[in-house]
Amino acid sequence: LAQMPEASVESCFSGKFEKDFETYLTDQFPMRDGWISAKTAIEKATFKTESKDIYFADDDYLIEAHSKSFTAPSANANIGYLKNFMETCVETYGKDHATAMVVPNAVDILRDHLPKYASPYDEEVYLQKVADAMPEGTWFDSGSVLREHKDIQLYYRTDHHWTTEAAYYVYAAWAEEKGLSPLALSDYKKKTLTDGFFGTVDALSLIHISEP
């Protein structure tokens, strides 16, 4: 949460203090978390399927819609930045040592979990633009690999990240494509570092409806 900003002549005249103070008031509103949690619980109880750009999906998934992420001006600009970076990598290290990969969000891969009539942006359209912009032979389609392994949990239910197991299968597929021998999944040891973190999407909704 935002902390009380320090006032200075520079921050006051630039408007930064006012902006930071407004953020501070929003974050430090009394019982803020309780109000957000109650609001989300009421919305879910009244059969709302979405709140704050988050879908209440099947199997207790909280899935971000990312409704504006791919239509913002920065979305196309980022393709250009990545294109330039990859061209430099290919020129410097060679095509065989440069791979571009963008992992799709849960809202794209787990469409079968979304509420009825949900209509998120089609990320595949954007990812195809990214793929087309990359130097030949450098794009790796992680989405296809993930769709082949939908029998496992690919994304955390209450966070936007993919699971470690999902990342493993993409790594293994990439390694095989490059002619490398990937380590077996059994070669890794799973270790739980904490059971008290439910993720960023859970923090936005504060409803705590499921296990990660």
Task: Identify the residue ranges that each predicted region occupies.
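Residue-level detector of conserved catalytic or cofactor/ligand-binding positions
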Residues: 207-212
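Serine-dependent acyl-ester chemistry module
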Residues: 5-81, 108-116
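Histidine-centered active-site loop/cap adjacent to the catalytic His
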Residues: 156-185
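Extracytoplasmic/secreted proteins, especially bacterial periplasmic and envelope-associated proteins
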Residues: 77, 81-84, 125-129, 165-169, ...
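Extracellular serine-dependent O-acyl
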Residues: 96-104, 119-152, 176, 181
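Charged, often glycine-rich, active-site loop that binds/positions anionic groups
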Residues: 111-120, 153-161
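Structured segments of extracytoplasmic/periplasmic soluble domains
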Residues: 85-92, 133, 170-181
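Acidic helix-start/capping segments at beta-turn-to-alpha-helix junctions
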Residues: 99-110, 147, 187-196
